[in-house]
From Swiss-Prot:
Belongs to the bacterial ribosomal protein bL25 family. CTC subfamily. This is one of the proteins that binds to the 5S RNA in the ribosome where it forms part of the central protuberance. Part of the 50S ribosomal subunit; part of the 5S rRNA/L5/L18/L25 subcomplex. Contacts the 5S rRNA. Binds to the 5S rRNA independently of L5 and L18. Pfam families: Ribosomal_L25p, Ribosomal_TL5_C. GO terms for biological process: translation. This is Large ribosomal subunit protein bL25. Keywords: Ribonucleoprotein, Ribosomal protein, RNA-binding, rRNA-binding. InterPro entries: Rbsml_bL25/Gln-tRNA_synth_N (IPR020056), Ribosomal_bL25/Gln-tRNA_synth (IPR011035), Ribosomal_bL25_b-dom (IPR020057), Ribosomal_bL25_C (IPR037121), Ribosomal_bL25_long (IPR001021), Ribosomal_L25_dom (IPR029751), Ribosomal_uL5_bac-type (IPR020930). GO terms for molecular function: 5S rRNA binding; structural constituent of ribosome. One of its GO terms (cellular component) is cytosolic large ribosomal subunit. CDD domains: Ribosomal_L25_TL5_CTC. The gene is rplY. The lineage of its organism: Bacteria, Pseudomonadati, Thermodesulfobacteriota, Desulfovibrionia, Desulfovibrionales.
Amino acid sequence: MDNLKTLVVQKRLDLGKGPNRRLHKKNLIPGIFYTSSGKNIPIQLPELPFTKIFSEVGRTTVFNLKIESDKENITHPVIIWELQYYPVKNRFMHVDLYGVELNKPIKIVVPLEFTGTAKGTKVGGKLETYREQLTLIANPLDIPSKITLDISDLDIGKSIYVADLKLPEGVKTSYDTNYAIVSVIMPGGNTATEQEG
């Protein structure tokens, strides 16, 4: 845990819309820390340090949450679970953080990044994408920030399946191996695999 980034927050004592509005005026974000044992701890996060750490770790990288209070200070590894934004302002309205155990696998959604240009699209094919993110299962420190998929060799009538993914060691996905992620089809044609969900 020593090499993880750390965010220092305080316990939030006053709850509700009124107190939350007052927090925002002080550049603080209301939030909840969900511990791995099932407790919910209301917290308030400093806006600028949280924005900085979010830009560095995103939604999939573990960091340390240090909660300061009059009685005790606790530190726990966490990931960002849910973010709420103001509809107009580019500011966080509420943050949920989820406590993790570093040696226990968790299930988490990770974005897919496609690189290259599918060669089938150069001869009239149409790229059909079924997933832009994947649910992975791994120990928290093994979770990649994204899965990169090179589609350069993808020809018309061909698909890339879950079985074709080169996942990091210790990482697996919750999907069946025959689940198609992306295909190249003829314009107006049917996709190679019937997708569900």
